[in-house]
UniProtKB/Swiss-Prot annotation:
Role, per record: Involved in succinate export with YjjP. Both proteins are required for export.
Lineage: Bacteria, Pseudomonadati, Pseudomonadota, Gammaproteobacteria, Enterobacterales
TM annotation in the entry: 2-22, 55-75, 87-107, 129-149
Pfam families for the chain: ThrE_2
Family of the protein in this entry: Belongs to the ThrE exporter (TC 2.A.79) family.
Membrane-related topology note: Multi-pass membrane protein
Name the record gives this protein: Probable succinate transporter subunit YjjB
UniProt entry keywords in alphabetical sequence: Cell inner membrane, Cell membrane, Membrane, Transmembrane, Transmembrane helix, Transport
Subunit-structure text: The transporter is composed of YjjB and YjjP.
Top-level division of the source organism's lineage: Bacteria
Subcellular location: Cell inner membrane
Naturally occurring in which organism (per UniProt): Klebsiella pneumoniae (strain 342)
Gene responsible for this protein: yjjB
Single biological process term from Gene Ontology: succinate transport
């Protein structure tokens, strides 16, 4: 993939990630002045995950590092705009949730219950379930670590 096509793919990915970030921010009753920042943070998070995956990271580690980035930026923006960090961060990580692998795991479970046990369906179910669980865990841990680092009251030593 050439550099120009990669930049266009990255811009498309970031633009398409900003749309659900704004949509979920509206569902969560985020103030109107913060909607553009939710969109920007969702685009930054999804774009950074795409860059890391293109560099060879697997999706779980790329998601974890992108969630760390989103959490850190969200805390900084919350100080600038005098708002809670969750206003920016929760809606921004929604585009990184593992919809396809969770859906594939659920379809595999339904097929196993309908057609009976088969080894390939069970492997598909377990691999997609573990992948989706790992991504959700990476998102939750990645969002919580910056708050633990930056809001620490006691000295680190």
């Amino acid at each position: 993939m050439g550099i120009i096509s990669f930049i266009f793919a990255l811009a498309e990915d970031m633009l398409l990630a900003a749309i659900p970030a704004v949509g979920f921010a509206m569902v969560f009753n985020v103030p109107q002045r913060a909607l553009r920042w939710c969109a920007l943070l969702g685009a930054i998070g999804h774009g950074s995950r795409m860059v890391m995956m293109s560099a060879g990271f697997n999706i779980e580690w790329a998601t974890f590092l992108a969630a760390l980035l989103v959490g850190s930026i969200g805390i900084q923006w919350s100080r600038w705009y005098l708002a809670h960090p969750k206003i920016f961060t929760v809606a921004a990580v929604i585009p990184m949730f593992p919809g396809i692998s969770a859906y594939t795991a659920m379809i595999s479970a339904v097929k196993i219950s309908h057609f009976g046990y088969s080894e390939e369906m069970m492997i598909l179910l377990l691999s997609n379930f573990l992948k989706a669980s790992s991504i959700v865990g990476a998102l939750s841990i990645g969002l919580s670590i910056p708050g633990l680092w930056l809001y620490r009251k006691r000295p680190r030593v």
